[in-house]
């Protein structure tokens, strides 16, 4: 089905009869609907995202502004149609493809320590977003949403304050700013891996109910997709593929339309830059000390998002949304997860199975004083992370360390936050250095 993430995306049908619309001119970008910001999970799990919930509207508006900017500058491989323009979408959309941003993490960590007799408050904000391109089709009277391309975005920021702790308003500003920065710095580069192209065929046989279309090859096509019938280079109707052969397809035609042999048809293909699809499917915490500091159900989704983000930076890697966290249903042919829209409605999205499932294991953490004198203590921190990719027969343990010099009786720190920050750095190292 979608194992190679090569999905021919077929244009939406105009109701027949209607005025013919011009075929897309050479060089003109295809249209994709931008459907806004979703939340990973369902109505029961919304409460796990307190920072997002109190910033839902502000975050949505800020990300929308950024998406409009890159769209207006022509930096994307397609033209975005925004949700406020849905009437225009119905008339102009060339395919069933949509783009959405999904919030998957909104973590805030804080620690206080003393430096030269002054209390310092450190705040860490971790924003996790996954961008998804998905195809929507009507199957048995219901919309079926299938993710065909995705990539993570991570906003990770630290802030140091004096004796006064960071307020909720300041945290909110840091949260939104980090999300916008992550989007601005990555969206164009990562969407550049997507190409939309046209494929053409010719009607060889036709009746009042169906037409047989010679497409040369049907590799990658699927039943249920749409094709446009063209006359004099203009769209005049759209039909649905109901049967596929090796080189041809049988297309159901709309009532009142009579295709003729020799008539041209057109479809729009979406292709990702790689057939190598990865997905973090598991994060374990096998270290007892690490488990006391970082419960698996909390650190797992965070580490999965970080690793996925850094792995995406490696050329040619298509990284599916992490299966760690959220609401997932798994089957032999793929997985499905639930998202919540801005109105609180739940939507089900399907995902093809990855070619390379990835497992992570936090195997150890360590912190100890390595040097000491009358004035200072030198503390060493170390974290170990194992990466396993069974389909590649690959397994390797990575480690990272850091040190902190503290003035005795004056400076202090919180061990957990030092190790948390080091784990973030280690996921980057592991993703970038893994021999895959």
Features from the language model and the residues they span:
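Short, surface-exposed secondary-structure edge patches
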Residues: 215-221, 255-259, 349-351
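Bacterial N-terminal signal peptides
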Residues: 6-17
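Sec/Tat signal peptide C-region and signal peptidase I cleavage site
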Residues: 19-25
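Amphipathic beta-strand/beta-sheet edge segments enriched in Tyr/Trp
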Residues: 100-162, 356-413
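N-terminal segment of the mature soluble domain
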Residues: 27-105, 141, 230-232, 283-285, ...
């Amino acid at each position: 089905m979608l194992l190679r993430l090569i999905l021919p995306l077929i244009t939406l049908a105009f109701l027949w009869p209607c005025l013919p619309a011009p075929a897309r001119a050479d060089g003109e970008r295809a249209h994709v609907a931008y459907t806004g910001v979703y939340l990973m999970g369902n109505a029961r799990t919304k409460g796990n995202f307190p920072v997002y919930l109190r910033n839902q509207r502000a975050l949505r508006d800020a990300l929308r502004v950024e998406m409009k900017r890159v769209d207006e500058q022509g930096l994307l491989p397609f033209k975005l149609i925004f949700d406020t323009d849905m009437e225009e979408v119905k008339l102009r959309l060339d395919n069933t493809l949509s783009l959405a941003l999904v919030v998957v993490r909104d973590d805030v960590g804080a620690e206080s320590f003393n430096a030269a007799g002054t209390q310092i408050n450190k705040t860490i904000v971790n924003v996790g977003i996954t961008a998804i391109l998905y195809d929507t089709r009507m199957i048995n009277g219901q919309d079926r949403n299938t993710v065909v391309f995705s990539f993570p975005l991570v906003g990770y920021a630290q802030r140091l304050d004096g004796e006064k702790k960071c307020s909720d308003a300041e945290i909110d500003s840091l949260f939104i700013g980090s999300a916008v920065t992550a989007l601005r710095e990555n969206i164009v580069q990562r969407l550049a891996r997507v190409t939309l192209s046209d494929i053409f065929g010719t009607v060889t046989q036709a009746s009042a109910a169906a037409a047989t279309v010679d497409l040369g090859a049907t590799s990658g096509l699927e039943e249920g997709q749409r094709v446009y019938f063209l006359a004099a280079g203009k769209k005049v109707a759209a039909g649905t593929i109901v049967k596929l052969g090796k080189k041809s397809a049988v297309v159901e035609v709309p009532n009142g339309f009579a295709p003729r042999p020799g008539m041209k048809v057109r479809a729009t293909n979406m292709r990702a830059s790689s057939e190598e699809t990865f997905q973090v499917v598991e994060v374990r915490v096998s270290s007892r000390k690490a488990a006391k500091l970082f419960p698996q159900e909390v650190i797992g989704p965070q580490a999965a998002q970080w690793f996925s983000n850094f792995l995406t930076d490696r050329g040619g890697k298509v990284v599916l949304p992490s299966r760690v966290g959220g609401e997932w249903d798994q089957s032999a042919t793929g997985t499905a997860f639930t998202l919540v829209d801005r109105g609180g409605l739940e939507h089900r999205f399907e995902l093809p199975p990855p070619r390379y499932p990835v497992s992570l294991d936090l195997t150890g953490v360590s912190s100890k004083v390595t040097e000491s004198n009358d004035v200072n203590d030198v503390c060493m921190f170390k974290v170990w992370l194992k990466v396993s990719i069974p389909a590649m027969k690959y397994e390797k343990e990575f480690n990272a360390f850091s040190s902190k010099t503290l003035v005795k009786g004056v400076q202090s720190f919180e061990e957990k936050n030092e190790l948390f920050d080091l784990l973030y750095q280690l996921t980057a190292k592991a993703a970038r250095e893994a021999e895959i």
